Swiss-Prot record:
Binding site for ATP: G65, P66, E67, S68, S69, G70, K71, T72
Biological process according to GO: DNA recombination; DNA repair; SOS response
Keyword DNA-binding attributed: yes
GO MF terms held by the record: ATP binding; ATP hydrolysis activity; ATP-dependent DNA damage sensor activity; damaged DNA binding; single-stranded DNA binding
Family annotation (Pfam families): RecA (PF00154), RecA_C (PF21096)
One cellular component (GO) term of this entry: cytosol
Lineage of source species: Bacteria, Pseudomonadati, Pseudomonadota, Gammaproteobacteria, Pseudomonadales
Protein name: Protein RecA
Keyword match Transcription: no
Role of this protein: Can catalyze the hydrolysis of ATP in the presence of single-stranded DNA, the ATP-dependent uptake of single-stranded DNA by duplex DNA, and the ATP-dependent hybridization of homologous single-stranded DNAs. It interacts with LexA causing its activation and leading to its autocatalytic cleavage.
Family: Belongs to the RecA family.
Alphabetical UniProt keywords: ATP-binding, Cytoplasm, DNA damage, DNA recombination, DNA repair, DNA-binding, Nucleotide-binding, SOS response
Compartment list: Cytoplasm
Organism: Pseudomonas syringae pv. syringae (strain B728a)
Amino acid sequence: MDDNKKKALAAALGQIERQFGKGAVMRMGDHDRQAIPAISTGSLGLDIALGIGGLPKGRIVEIYGPESSGKTTLTLSVIAQAQKMGATCAFVDAEHALDPEYAGKLGVNVDDLLVSQPDTGEQALEITDMLVRSNAIDVIVVDSVAALVPKAEIEGEMGDMHVGLQARLMSQALRKITGNIKNANCLVIFINQIRMKIGVMFGSPETTTGGNALKFYASVRLDIRRTGAVKEGDEVVGSETRVKVVKNKVAPPFRQAEFQILYGKGIYLNGEIVDLAVLHGFVEKSGAWYSYQGSKIGQGKANSAKFLADNPEICKALEKQIRDKLLTPGVDTKAVGSREAVAADDMSEADVDI
């Protein structure tokens, strides 16, 4: 850059700092690059598929899927993991359906969890914004976007038409709170439901509620589905779950993770650790027997997972080995989940910002 341009730039930067404050414009090279802080999801496979070890702080995340697919369970698992790190969490229960007893079984400290059950969508989003601006909250879950009913719709008659009200509400709210979320380094998770578009001939007819604003403002979008049942004999004790990372602005997108959710217990982490440890050679499998460092730890996956539950030090050591190997920059995370075909709508929004 020639001297005249340097002088002009210095004058402009000086004027900007005087008018808007120091740090309004910064040179990227003047500061060390720092890894984006993340909060674990409670699923080792999903943490690895996300590329940074969990959900990013200071960002908006959308989790959507069909009914009974595990959306609320996954968010409660995130809250439980955050609380273990000493974080303060809030749950905005717009659906008025949070079960404290179930949350406690998943490891959530319900005594310290802040809960709000707002009457209208405007109230829910205003409460969310105020909690973010307090700079004292680390994780906020909004359950769900579909239940954020505008005040005009609640006060109107049952058959009244309110076209686009919820979409406008979400768009306005997200414009307002996005900057605050970054400044507060707070993770905000929106749970969303699926609807069907009428008359779609080609492509997926599925869409999410609340308009398109959330799709663009979200740094991470997770599509969670129930793929099967977990049985003990004839009794169904849980569900097989698949999560696709359909948008990721902090790591490569389109990874997927598969894990089990056990009823009344949550994500089956020890089972995941056994599977991944075998896949990457940390645990040896011979027939039905599993061995770790030359010693047998159990016959069958269930017994091996029970051994890890009874020996938390070995469990933590195995988990650390897996994380160190798969979350090292440059390591291909396809070992956990492959790239999956996603809807064209998701492809168009999946910006990558590494």
